[in-house]
Amino acid sequence: MTIRFEEKVSTENAQFVCQWSNSLGKVFQEQWIGPRIPFLLTLQALEGVFSIFDEQEFVGLIQKIRLEDSNLHIGRFFINPQKQEQGLGGQALRKFVSLAFENEDIDSISLNVFEANQRAQNLYQKEGFEIVQMVEAPVRKYSRLKLE
């Protein structure tokens, strides 16, 4: 397994992401990208992301959402459902975090995950993220996790 990243997502790969997300349904999509982006996912909603490749195969994406006060907030991390449970998610997250910390302006990395998404929460905690806040949102509860 050789994970690498490319800034942006090609139209062809964005179509794969839309297919993957749409095939998992509205509930999954709201957990993954939030309720502001309507189901069915379209290409226009995928700006500002990095493509994740295993060798030459496109396997997922991750987004740098914002940098505030030396904290990089990331999100919309998604691995092809057919490639999950193979260690790609952990390896991709470790490498992305490692590359982010090479930037001297970044001291911490945060992300949000819905409480019901235990699989994602377990992955983030396994990779060293810690829950720093529980947020009661109008629709559902989520955790804010941070890695320093």
Regions found by a protein language model. Name each.
Residues 3-82, 99, 103, 134-137:
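Acetyl-CoA-dependent GNAT
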Residues 90, 115-133:
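Conserved active-site alpha-helix within GNAT-family acetyltransferase domains
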Residues 111-121, 137-142:
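Conserved beta-strand-loop-alpha-helix junction that forms the acyl-donor binding cleft
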Residues 102-112:
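Conserved GNAT acetyl-CoA-binding A-motif
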Residues 80-82, 86, 115-116:
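Active-site acidic-Proline motif in GNAT/NAT acetyltransferases
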Residues 142-148:
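Terminal substrate-recognition subdomain of acyl/acetyltransferases
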Residues 95, 99, 122-123:
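Structural preference for long, well-ordered alpha-helical segments within the folded cores
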Residues 83, 87-96:
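Conserved acetyl-CoA pyrophosphate-binding loop and the N-cap/start of the following alpha-helix
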